[in-house]
Amino acid sequence: MNFKYIVAVSILIASAYARSEENDIQSLSQRDVLEEESLREIRGIGAAILSAGKSALKGLAKGLAEHFGKRTAEDHEVMKRLEAAIHSLSQRDVLEEESLREIRGIGAAILSAGKSALKGLAKGLAEHFGKRTAEEHEMMKRLEAVMRDLDSLDYPEEASEMETRSFNQEEIANLYTKKEKRILGPILGLVSNALGGLLG
């Protein structure tokens, strides 16, 4: 009894397992079919897009060929004028390059002349001041003395501290006036002599 029961249960389990396997196989085959159909649809859509793209490109190429193959006389004239303008621009570039070379040459010549002129001026000044006469030397010595006196006016306490201690304020003012007169006279004379020498 028990043996029959075990056999019956085993048969039921085996049949259930077989049905499950069959269902799995059927499900897998259905999935494969769906995937295949999806792939076919995708390929069809891609082919349609590619075909449309090819047709569009062919139409564009044909339109461009017709447009440029059937240019009017006016279009041809415009193209000729454009080519002439490009040629003129290239010639202008050559002329501009030549002009730039000429300008550079002129600038170099001017710079060289300017350097020569400055060298000549410096040489002339060196010769002039290097060969001063005794009179000019004396005039320069007097000018240096005047400058020293001007310094003493700026700093009277340092220049003549011992001298100013015994004077009152009024005498100091008189001393400044005398010094200014004594200094301004030679300065004006030196300036007039220098201007006369330069202008003469």
Curated annotation (Swiss-Prot):
Tissue specificity field: Expressed by the skin glands.
Residues recorded as bearing Phenylalanine amide in the entry: 68, 129
UniProt entry keywords in alphabetical sequence: Amidation, Amphibian defense peptide, Antibiotic, Antimicrobial, Cleavage on pair of basic residues, Repeat, Secreted, Signal
Main location: secreted
GO terms for cellular component: extracellular region
Purpose of the protein: Has antimicrobial activity, but no hemolytic activity. Preference on killing Gram-negative non-enteric bacteria.
Similarity-based family: Belongs to the bombinin family.
Any one Gene Ontology BP term: defense response to bacterium
Source organism (scientific name): Bombina orientalis
Cellular location(s): Secreted
Leader sequence residues: 1-16
Protein name: Bombinin-like peptides 3
Record bears the keyword Signal: yes
Domain of life: Eukaryota
Pfam families: Bombinin (PF05298)
